[in-house]
A protein has these predicted regions:
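Non-catalytic interface/targeting segments
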Residues: 1-53, 60, 79, 87-107
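Mid-chain, well-packed structural core segment of small domains
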Residues: 55-85
């Protein structure tokens, strides 16, 4: 499973989905997560539907983790079959919280 994490500094989940300029992509095998890729998004605050460009950057992912997301972007992710998780803090902590939740839900 691929997880995209919105981060401006590569260390913290600290970005709104539609305004995120970078995503760290992790591969989660059910036990641990490893970094696969870093993806840049050309953010243009004047662009009305920035979230569409952002969605293109993560369209091969199963989960997106960001601080917040707008309603249209959330529907766009859902239509693409991508689950959104709202969280913030150090990426390692956020990923571990998600893994614990995932394992709990699978048990």
């Amino acid at each position: 499973m691929k997880i995209a994490v919105a981060s401006s500094d590569g260390e913290n989940v600290d970005s709104h989905f539609g305004k995120a300029s970078k995503f760290i992509i992790y591969e989660f095998d059910g036990e641990k997560a490893e970094i696969l890729d870093e993806r840049e998004v050309n953010v243009n605050p004047a662009e009305k539907h920035q979230w569409i460009k952002t969605l293109e950057a993560v369209k091969d992912c199963d989960i997106v983790i960001a601080v917040q997301i707008g309603l249209r972007a959330k529907f766009g992710l859902e239509e693409a079959g991508i689950r959104f998780v709202s969280d913030e803090g150090p990426i390692e902590d956020v990923i571990m919280r998600y893994i614990r939740h995932y394992k709990f839900m699978k048990s």
